[in-house]
Amino acid sequence: MSTQSAFFSSTYPRGLITRLCGLAWMVWMLWEGAHKMLQGAEGNQVPEAFQTFCMDCHDSDTAKGNLDLEQALKHPPLDASLAFEQLITGGMPPAEKPQPGPMERHQMLTHLANRQTQMNLPSSRRLSRQEFIHSVNDLLGLDWDLSEALPTGKGTFLFDSDRRILPTEPWMAAVFHVTDRLLNRAFPSKGFPAEQRWVTQRLRHSHDSYDIYTRPTEEGILFSWTRANNGNSYSFFYDDFEPPLSGWYEIQVEAKKQGAIERDISIEVYAGKYYFADDRPQPQRLLGVLSLSSPEIQPHTLRARLHPGDQISIHCYAEENFREQDPERGALIRKISIRGPLVNTWPPTSLSKTFAGFPLKVPERIIQTMPPPQTHLQAIGGGLQVSSFQEGMEKEYMQDGIARTFWHSRFKPEVASPPHFVILENPHRQILRGLLYSTWTGGNGNGQVKTYRIQASENGSEWGPSIAEGDLDVQLAHEQTIAFKEPIDSPFLRFEITDALSLDGRSIASIGELDVLVDEAPEERQWQIIEPADTSVSVLQEVILRFAKRALGNDPAQELIEASLAIAQRSMDQGDPFLTALKAGLKTLLCSPSFLMTPVIDPQDGPSTASTLARILWLSVPDDVLIEMTQRGPLNREDMRGQILRMLQDARSQRMVRSFVGQWLGLDGFDQVTPSLKLYPAYDTLLHHFLPKETEMFMAHLMRENLTIDHLIDSDISFLNQRLARHYGIEGVVGAQMRRVRLDPASHRGGLLTMGSILKMTTDGFESSPIRRGAWVSKQLMGNPLPPPPPSVPTLEPHHGLEASLKEQINQHTQQAACRACHKIIDPYGFGLESFDASGQWRERYRVIQPHSGTFQYRPEGYYQWADPVDASGTLQGQSFRDIQSMKALLRQDLKKVAYHFAKVWFHYASGAEPTLHERIALHAMIPEDPSRLGMADLMTKVLIHVMRDDTR
């Protein structure tokens, strides 16, 4: 039996495994059936309107655009989506041609819908990874995002809610693993760790080329703003803290703004693996941004998830003091305090929620204040002796945890005679397994140890034979381990330097850090177990049954309940602790098809309605309000509308906003392109962090405040902070906090098109491609139906600074007939956005890279020169525009098309399937003739009610 098979069989009874496999097989069969096209209504007479309005261009003789509508209508089924979209949005017939009346157009659309090829899609689908994680977290009272541990399975589908995404064996195995991790976090077998608290005021050593941008003061450490030579944000690492366990931690930075700096200073707080120099950086993740405005020291707090091995580092951003050496102004940090792992309440919500109504045995919360860190030698009560020392470079520096300070043998006024050595005292005869050595950093290397010999002694004067000897690396600054062949408990060890680097031939020696290697000390952490006062089988059964109703609806399948209870009972019978048995039973529920597959939408079934609404709007399970309402019976339209609007106001709807907007607009791929620092040297991690947040917050505001749909095209508001406002050239916004900002009517900003996130990700990081941007506007915002580009036509990437202008290059490309039709639609949108560079900043001239010699070294002025003036004019559907503002005015004339496309993509996200042509007719009918007054929430609600109540799919 394989390991995986053994895992399955030991965790689930055979019947449950069979049902899981049967479900996967059933979904697969449905998927196979989806490829069998169903012919629409045969024998439908083709409306005369097609002959009247279409056949001049699309009969068999003409077939303009390779569309022979005459033959297509004679031989159904057909893929009529392109023709349908042109017809329903008014793109066809062309504006200069006679137009069908409303009734005739409706007849034509209905006929195309009837003839459209259809696919049988599964009526249910598997949960997306975000839906699974949020659902389990909400059920258990957790806040622990493990979505990255689950495969997306999205592939090339637009949304991860697509019903064609199937459950697979790797996905199920990942679900099992993640479920275990979440249940263990909710009900840890060892108990909950005591909260520990640390304080650090020391920096870990950094390269000398960056240390000069910090200055120790009586109050703390003063930082100026610097960037590494490669352009990355250079972070200074704090010492004396490393999280012992994964969990949530509170990080408090006591700091102030010092000196003449006009705006707030931003402190970026990172976590990641420590690195010494920027030539070997390690991945860092941004935990949060703090804003310093006061000249008085104040506490600034953030919460973040940390893991063992993480090191806290900070990067201080203030544009006025870039690379000021030995700074007099900047961010002054007195100390950093950390506490954790945190629990949201005591007792934790996972227990108080799961065992609501049952008494718990809850110990008093333990808080441990951690002592200042010690070296291993200090911890065992040891000490050091040295053969000699130079004043200011004493032996204590080998035990201060900072490798840029060091011990050095005496070299003036006279050079100490060899041998040079260090004696390590072990008064309590602790078992030693080796030594830890670090060279000193930041200097010329003079005195660094090349070879060594180690001897042991019982009295500190008579030394035995060598117990270890060898070479040390003098090239790199890192900790090196010297392991003994056998552990030793001698009270004295002598580390003799037998050869050292010398620049002038004198006999000298130096060491940055030297410590002993000992067995791990007993864990200092205390664990606190919480469990119900009554751990009987009846309590176990009641808790599992109640959980099942919350997770699966009020009427979960009886056989699933029985399987869950049987597994929990078996665990208890085997002598497992109560919480272990509970986790086994809950895992059965959470890994069952009933939980992992979305319910079939049934407007007459209250629990199904509640589950579907919660999944769409919260990516989770229903709350008590929704459950209570749906228990009374099916929701009518007004009740459903009220619940949708209520749920949009709930903070949990931000999950939907992030998911929907990220996939629809492409923000999920925001990190794939980074602007070139040669062309756009002002682009930094702070800007990169906040750009997508502007778009997410803007879209959430439109939905919650029911602002009109035209805000997508142009708006007088956005969400900015100091860094974004500076990037956009907007005055009066101070501080790192994102807030709603009223835009000046003369501003170039407003709406999605001019947001830096959109402008950045629709380029290659160097050039602003009108083709890429135009295609994005055409597809994501306008919904223009476009066929794929011909395979034989090469991709065009325009370049500035050539003899041919940008537009001339594109026009030459589009002379090919195969390219002209699409580029006629997409290129004008891109031309209108040419006043924005690849970082999203306004410009009036193009930049071209200026050659430089040697390796790239970051500099604020970059490596570019100015080239041609920007031309942001164009022609859209026969109407000319001169800039982005006049192009927006033309787009607002096509607002009904924008609203219709938004309705389609929201329908797709909510239902898990693209709307059929019949459904598109219904969606289009929701858009009023004057859509400028159509609220975003109103439209979303209409579409969602249609999804929920249309049981014809």
Annotate each predicted stretch with a short phrase.
Residues I261-E268, P327-A331, N444-R453, I508-A509:
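Short coil-to-beta strand junction motifs in C2/discoidin
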Residues H111, S135-L140, D162-S293, P299-Y317, ...:
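Extended surface/linker regions that mediate inter-domain or inter-protein docking
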Residues H35-P102, A304-P308, A725, R740-Q885, ...:
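Sequence context surrounding c-type heme c attachment/ligation sites in exported
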Residues M1-I17:
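N-terminal secretory signal peptides that target proteins for export/translocation
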Residues K36-Q201, G309, Y317-I366, E520-I530, ...:
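Aromatic- and Gly/Pro-enriched helix-to-coil junctions and flexible linker segments
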Residues C21-E32:
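Bacterial N-terminal signal peptides
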Residues P372, S388-A468, L476-A533:
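Aromatic, loop-rich ligand-recognition surfaces of beta-strand-rich domains
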Residues H315-P327, E496-G505:
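Short beta-strand-plus-loop segments that form exposed binding edges in beta-rich domains
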